[in-house]
């Protein structure tokens, strides 16, 4: 335990808070190109085939991001926009792909929470 004199000479340094989405480099979204689109299975109590894509960002980082909603049109070399936000039951997936932006189509026949899935207003 330091003495008061030592604390006056060199005060305590606050712990630095690390960002949970570091590869975005403090940007709200980042553009990238899909290098691989595949499905993966979630952690223990859950069971599904979750759609994910490996994306090379414009800053050179490669990240795994989740494709939300039913059905998608993504394939290799698709240009996508990603945002932060992890998927709790997929280890290593810390980003989401934005639907209805760039090469990603919105979810078809979506009626509720449309803005989250890039769906147009139904007629």
Swiss-Prot record:
<keyword id="KW-0689">Ribosomal protein</keyword>
<dbReference type="InterPro" id="IPR012340">
    <property type="entry name" value="NA-bd_OB-fold"/>
</dbReference>
<dbReference type="GO" id="GO:0003735">
    <property type="term" value="F:structural constituent of ribosome"/>
</dbReference>
<dbReference type="InterPro" id="IPR006032">
    <property type="entry name" value="Ribosomal_uS12"/>
</dbReference>
<dbReference type="GO" id="GO:0019843">
    <property type="term" value="F:rRNA binding"/>
</dbReference>
<feature type="region of interest" description="Disordered">
    <location>
        <begin position="1"/>
        <end position="28"/>
    </location>
</feature>
<keyword id="KW-0699">rRNA-binding</keyword>
<keyword id="KW-0694">RNA-binding</keyword>
<dbReference type="GO" id="GO:0006412">
    <property type="term" value="P:translation"/>
</dbReference>
<keyword id="KW-0820">tRNA-binding</keyword>
<comment type="function">
    <text>With S4 and S5 plays an important role in translational accuracy.</text>
</comment>
<dbReference type="Pfam" id="PF00164">
    <property type="entry name" value="Ribosom_S12_S23"/>
</dbReference>
<keyword id="KW-0488">Methylation</keyword>
<comment type="function">
    <text>Interacts with and stabilizes bases of the 16S rRNA that are involved in tRNA selection in the A site and with the mRNA backbone. Located at the interface of the 30S and 50S subunits, it traverses the body of the 30S subunit contacting proteins on the other side and probably holding the rRNA structure together. The combined cluster of proteins S8, S12 and S17 appears to hold together the shoulder and platform of the 30S subunit.</text>
</comment>
<comment type="similarity">
    <text>Belongs to the universal ribosomal protein uS12 family.</text>
</comment>
<dbReference type="InterPro" id="IPR005679">
    <property type="entry name" value="Ribosomal_uS12_bac"/>
</dbReference>
<comment type="subunit">
    <text>Part of the 30S ribosomal subunit. Contacts proteins S8 and S17. May interact with IF1 in the 30S initiation complex.</text>
</comment>
<feature type="modified residue" description="3-methylthioaspartic acid">
    <location>
        <position position="89"/>
    </location>
</feature>
<keyword id="KW-0687">Ribonucleoprotein</keyword>
<dbReference type="GO" id="GO:0000049">
    <property type="term" value="F:tRNA binding"/>
</dbReference>
<protein>
    <recommendedName>
        <fullName>Small ribosomal subunit protein uS12</fullName>
    </recommendedName>
</protein>
<dbReference type="GO" id="GO:0015935">
    <property type="term" value="C:small ribosomal subunit"/>
</dbReference>
């Amino acid at each position: 335990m330091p003495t008061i004199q030592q604390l006056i000479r060199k005060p305590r340094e606050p712990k630095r808070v690390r960002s949970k989405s570091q590869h975005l480099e403090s940007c709200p979204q980042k553009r990238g190109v899909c290098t691989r689109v595949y499905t993966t299975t979630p952690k223990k109590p859950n069971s599904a085939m979750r759609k994910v894509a490996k994306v090379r960002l414009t800053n050179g980082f490669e990240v795994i991001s989740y494709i939300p909603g039913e059905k998608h049109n993504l394939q290799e070399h698709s240009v996508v926009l990603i945002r932060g936000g992890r998927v709790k039951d997929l280890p290593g997936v810390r980003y989401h792909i934005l639907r209805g932006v760039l090469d990603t189509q919105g979810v078809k026949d979506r009626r509720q929470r449309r803005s989250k899935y890039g769906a147009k207003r139904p007629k």
